[in-house]
């Protein structure tokens, strides 16, 4: 769209502005990296009855609230004019967390369109004024809830402790809080959301694989993914490369 090229922003370093459309192979890596991985994707696939390899079908179904500033809609659908939220209790939040092993991202439930990358169970939630709200139909969230990893029951405490320790050491890390839920879970504030007086603003972001145009299968260095040098080189595109490279090291 010419208007978007004039006033918008590129979705990715790997998808710079240009008049000609990109082919499917070039765009696939960016969108595939918005989706969950491994066993989580396999379970979601069964719940929504869409093939694991059908990236765009997945996003059409669950891509309402993704990482960054994107909301993926089916052709012809329009964004919500007003976000919708359901206030929930801590007990109800625990019930939602307990569903995740069987229903990752709560996929397949009416009004639920959530997608987060990674191989661990998690769900986005909105937390305002010490109250929890469930974001319906892809409304923006503010935090991410992470339960313990299967067979590793103390990961909640371990991950939260490491985050607090990093913050105490002066590192720039999001706020975390262990929740009084059963099963146990902790909450981390989203760095790609800004809470404004009357709204929640999405901040666009991408990971290294998206910025380099690499598929999910090449996320890890031992599987052909980027190493430290490639990541350092990529940060030359940032406004302040030296600071960002220092942050990467820590």
Which residues are covered by each model-predicted region?
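Phosphate/dinucleotide-binding and metal-coordinating scaffold of catalytic cores
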Residues: 1-250
């Amino acid at each position: 769209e010419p208007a978007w090229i004039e006033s918008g922003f590129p979705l990715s370093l790997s998808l710079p502005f240009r008049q000609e459309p990109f082919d499917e192979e070039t765009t696939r890596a960016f969108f595939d990296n918005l989706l969950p991985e491994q066993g989580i994707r396999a379970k979601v696939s069964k719940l929504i009855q869409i093939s694991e390899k059908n990236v765009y079908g997945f996003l059409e179904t669950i891509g309402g609230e993704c990482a960054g500033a994107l909301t993926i809609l089916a052709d012809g659908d329009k964004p919500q004019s007003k976000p919708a939220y359901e206030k929930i209790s801590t007990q109800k939040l625990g019930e939602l967390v307990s569903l995740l092993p069987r229903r990752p991202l709560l996929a397949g439930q009416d009004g639920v369109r959530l997608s987060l990358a990674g191989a661990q169970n998690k769900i986005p939630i909105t937390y305002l004024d010490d109250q929890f709200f469930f974001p319906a139909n892809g409304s923006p969230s503010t935090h991410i809830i992470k339960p313990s990893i299967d067979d590793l029951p103390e990961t909640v405490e371990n991950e939260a402790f490491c985050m607090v320790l990093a913050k105490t050491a002066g590192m720039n890390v999001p706020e975390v809080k262990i929740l009084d839920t059963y099963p146990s879970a902790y909450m981390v504030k989203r760095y790609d959301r800004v809470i404004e007086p009357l709204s929640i603003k999405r901040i666009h972001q991408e990971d290294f694989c998206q910025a380099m145009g690499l598929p999910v299968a090449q996320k890890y260095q031992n599987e052909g993914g980027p190493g430290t040098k490639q990541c350092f080189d990529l940060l030359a595109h940032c406004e302040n490369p030296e600071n960002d490279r220092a942050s990467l090291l820590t």
